[in-house]
Amino acid sequence: GVAPANAPQLIRSARELGYQGLISTETAQDATVLREGAGDLANGFISVGGASTPKIASDTMKEFVSRYTKMFGEYNDESNTKVYALEYIIETMKANPASINNVAEFKKTMDTFSAPNIYMKGDSKLKYVGTTSFGQKRQVFVPMVVNEYQNGKFETLFIAEVD
């Protein structure tokens, strides 16, 4: 992945050197930083973003966005990933209270854990994934929101899941 602060210069350099192909990253980015650092040269840039998009965001997620914006002055795609961490920890420990003081119990709980995802509309669940890629469930599940940067903002291309 590419750090949001580095993406504009990398995009700008590639475009100014004549590269016209696809540029993408597997990390969430900040449209404001791209606009300020690369401008129209960033058009067409694709990133796999944070954890939500307005189309699938629940009222709880919208409240988080509002509170985050008030506290930090702006909200961006990268910020979406921050909402989930504490919810996963708390819900996993509620599913198995022994996991509060026992890492082995926490890991065991990850294999079967599921809880309602309060940040998304519909019946999405909090769960751990990673079996296919890593042979064990050690990654928190968040929807993969694939975005394309165009004219100063991100447009969602599609939303996907991994196992």
Q: Where do the protein language model's features map onto the residues?
A:
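Solvent-exposed, polar/charged alpha-helical surfaces in well-ordered, non-transmembrane soluble domains
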Residues: P8, R12, K62, S66, ...
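Hydrophobic alpha-helical
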Residues: G1-L17, A85, I89, N147
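Short, basic, helix/turn surface patches
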Residues: G1-A3, G49-A57, V103-K107
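Extracytoplasmic ligand-binding clamshell segments of periplasmic binding protein
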Residues: A5-P8, D77-E78, T132
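Segments of small-molecule ligand-sensing domains
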Residues: K70-N76, E91-F154
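Extracellular/periplasmic periplasmic-binding protein-like sensory domains
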Residues: S13-Y84, A95-P97, L157-V162
